[in-house]
């Protein structure tokens, strides 16, 4: 870290967990994860609870790193979760069966991956603001529900559900879809108040747990009534990116009320 500081102003160090205090310098990651649904199901809990020891900039190998088998649905669900994680990092061992780039999948999966990656770009203003709060105030970027609702039993029971920044509640789908319904599902606890689907604005009453169903190209993310989400209005498309073009943001805001 000190050597990197001498050469460059902004640096990234990626490291495994190395004991208490090791969160101060690097981005952490959860190790070489196996490509499986069981592994994905563990990652949201692992990511949010890393904040318990100060490791708020925590990442995971999106899609899994090794072993397992090629599973397009698993890869897309993991990428969706990655878009709403502190660090969005596709990674795998060198193999034609484990590659996670969108162009390695069929048209439906590829386009959905592209849409979610462009959404990640749109979220930069929101994530940047949340990261500033993390850096200046020490508030975790990702929090287990019990940080905000410590007296609610449900906050401890829904281990894969978490808060991203101050405005978004995320509930990744981590199980295979129902073959009959052709939808994935996850049980979501809605704390007190009114919550809105981040993508379509559908309202949900609070103080209730519901099984929420989503098609393979959709993901459960919610904003509480009154939330203001700053977004980039026009994320760059791949054909617009050139070595000469400077990176820019054109802001917009989503308001949930």
Positions of predicted regions on the chain:
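Accessory, solvent-exposed terminal regions and/or long lumenal/extracellular loops of proteins
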Residues: 218-257
């Amino acid at each position: 870290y000190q050597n990197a500081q001498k050469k460059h102003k902004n640096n990234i160090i990626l490291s495994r967990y190395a004991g208490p205090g090791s969160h101060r310098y690097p981005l952490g990651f959860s190790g070489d994860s196996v490509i499986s649904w069981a592994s994905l199901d563990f990652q949201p809990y692992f990511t949010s609870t890393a904040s318990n020891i100060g490791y708020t900039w925590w990442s995971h190998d999106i899609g899994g790193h090794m072993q397992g088998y090629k599973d397009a649905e698993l890869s897309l669900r993991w990428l969706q979760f990655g878009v709403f994680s502190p660090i969005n990092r596709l990674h795998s061992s060198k193999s034609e069966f484990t590659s996670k780039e969108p162009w390695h999948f069929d048209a439906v999966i590829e386009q959905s991956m592209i849409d979610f990656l462009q959404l990640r770009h749109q979220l930069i203003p929101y994530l940047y603001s949340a990261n500033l709060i993390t850096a200046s105030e020490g508030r975790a970027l990702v929090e287990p529900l019990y940080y905000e609702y410590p007296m609610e039993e449900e906050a401890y029971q829904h281990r894969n559900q978490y808060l991203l920044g101050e405005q978004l509640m995320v509930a990744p789908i981590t199980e295979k879809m129902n073959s009959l319904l052709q939808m994935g599902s996850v049980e979501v606890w809605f704390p007190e108040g009114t919550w809105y689907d981040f993508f379509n604005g559908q309202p949900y009453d609070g103080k209730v747990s519901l099984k929420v169903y989503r098609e393979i190209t959709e993901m459960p993310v919610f904003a509480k009534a009154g939330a203001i989400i700053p977004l980039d209005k026009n994320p760059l498309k791949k054909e617009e990116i050139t070595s000469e073009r400077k990176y820019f943001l054109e802001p917009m805001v989503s308001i949930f009320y």
